[in-house]
């Protein structure tokens, strides 16, 4: 049993750690026959009445006064424990020391947490082993305990390594965010400086957002820019080539700018994390965030742009959970006459009142499939309803008026020439 209490490196006392505090227990006797200071042991085990504890829980043969254990003035053997006194005072000599058996008796009777663990070890492991095998191998238990400690130490090391990695990742992400924020500030600053330098120049270029009915339900939008209005019109033709009516693209946002490339470059840089594919211009983002963000870039609002950039998690959450915002298509005829060099046309002076009234009646009764108004189908409907009107040489003007009237009736209608 002495393997449970290692006295090989002890001399005057042994030190144990309990509740994160070190306690010293004075020793006497030899390594083979050790004695422990009863008072010190009782204090460690939480006994309030030391004299009563020694009387109740330690047998007479397991306790001796120090004066009977010490050989005062004699030569101590090499394994002698405790101090060698030249003179032992009366009080020191009366101090009660207990044998190893007495020590275990006090432990077995104590309510201290580690004493309960010791009792379980003795009653559940050691004694059953002696009953079954006639002996108990402490080495096996110590080996198992050491393995458990090694596993615990390994787990703690792995946890520390993981925490270190997480700290490094957070630090790197913070450094990257600071660097990205600095770069964005510089980029927006250059855009602002450019806008300031060119504010007297009339904006003739365009930034647009377009989508389809299906894309709009999926929070998907194409964001880009063109140099002229004619290119803006042809852009839809490019997008819609080979597409069915239900997949036709339409504009939901158009703004003029002095230099669309600088705006487009800023948008691509700041919204790169929301692009469906890095090689195309399709973005996945809730429209409410997207339009505010594009407006912020167009207006040179660096603070809002950075706010959006720093709230990517919220943007992603809104994109996943919020219902899509449905925006009606923009009819290019509503803006085409405001280009530089163009004079507004008064279509009411081109067509007579009877033709305009017939077009309005046709619009009121027309129900286009999938909200797509095709020119030829509408003309057939118009002539079927009003066969007396003449459209020769006026088809384009009639179509323009029909689109203007149709946009008033249903902003969601799209038009195909």
From Swiss-Prot:
Database matches in SMART domains: Bro-N
Any Pfam family hit: T5orf172
Superkingdom of origin: Viruses
Coiled coil: 152-193
Domain Bro-N: 4-134
Keywords of this entry: Coiled coil
Entry similarity comment: Belongs to the IIV-6 201R/289L family.
UniProt name for this protein: Putative Bro-N domain-containing protein 289L
Provenance organism: Invertebrate iridescent virus 6 (IIV-6)
Lineage of the organism: Viruses, Varidnaviria, Bamfordvirae, Nucleocytoviricota, Megaviricetes
């Amino acid at each position: 049993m002495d393997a449970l209490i290692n006295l090989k490196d002890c001399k005057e006392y042994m030190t144990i750690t309990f509740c994160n505090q070190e306690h010293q227990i004075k020793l006497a006797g030899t390594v083979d026959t050790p004695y422990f200071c009863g008072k010190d042991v009782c204090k460690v085990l939480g006994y309030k009445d030391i004299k009563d504890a020694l009387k109740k829980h330690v047998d007479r043969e397991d306790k001796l006064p120090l004066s009977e254990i010490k050989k005062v003035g004699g030569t101590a053997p090499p394994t002698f424990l405790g101090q060698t006194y030249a003179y032992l005072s009366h009080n020191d000599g009366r101090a009660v020391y207990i044998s190893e058996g007495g020590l275990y008796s006090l432990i077995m009777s104590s309510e201290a947490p580690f004493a309960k663990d010791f009792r379980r070890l003795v009653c559940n492991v050691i004694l059953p082993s002696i009953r079954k095998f006639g002996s108990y191998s402490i080495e096996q238990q110590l080996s198992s305990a050491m393995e458990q400690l090694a596993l615990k130490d390994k787990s703690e090391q792995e946890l520390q390594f993981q925490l270190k990695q997480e700290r490094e990742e957070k630090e790197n992400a913070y450094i990257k965010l600071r660097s990205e924020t600095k770069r964005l500030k510089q980029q927006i600053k250059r855009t602002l400086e450019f806008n300031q330098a060119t504010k007297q120049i009339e904006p003739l270029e365009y930034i647009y957002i377009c989508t389809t009915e299906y894309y709009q339900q999926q929070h998907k939008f194409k964001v880009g820019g063109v140099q002229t209005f004619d290119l803006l019109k042809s852009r839809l033709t490019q997008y819609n080539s080979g597409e069915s009516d239900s997949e036709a693209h339409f504009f939901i946002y158009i703004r003029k700018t002095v230099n669309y490339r600088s705006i487009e470059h800023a948008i691509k840089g700041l919204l790169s994390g929301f692009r469906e594919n890095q090689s195309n211009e399709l973005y996945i983002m809730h429209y409410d965030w997207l339009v505010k963000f594009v407006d912020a870039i167009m207006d040179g609002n660096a603070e809002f742009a950075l706010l959006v950039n720093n709230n990517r998690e919220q943007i992603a959450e809104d994109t996943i959970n919020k219902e899509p915002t449905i925006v009606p298509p923009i009819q290019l005829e509503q803006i085409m006459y405001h280009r530089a060099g163009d004079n507004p046309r008064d279509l009411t002076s081109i067509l007579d009142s009877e033709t305009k009234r017939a077009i309005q009646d046709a619009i009121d009764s027309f129900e286009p499939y999938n909200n797509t108004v095709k020119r030829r189908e509408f003309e057939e409907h118009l002539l079927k309803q009003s066969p007396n009107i003449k459209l020769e040489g006026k088809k384009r003007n009639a179509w323009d008026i029909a689109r203007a009237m149709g946009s008033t009736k249903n902003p969601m209608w799209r038009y195909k020439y």
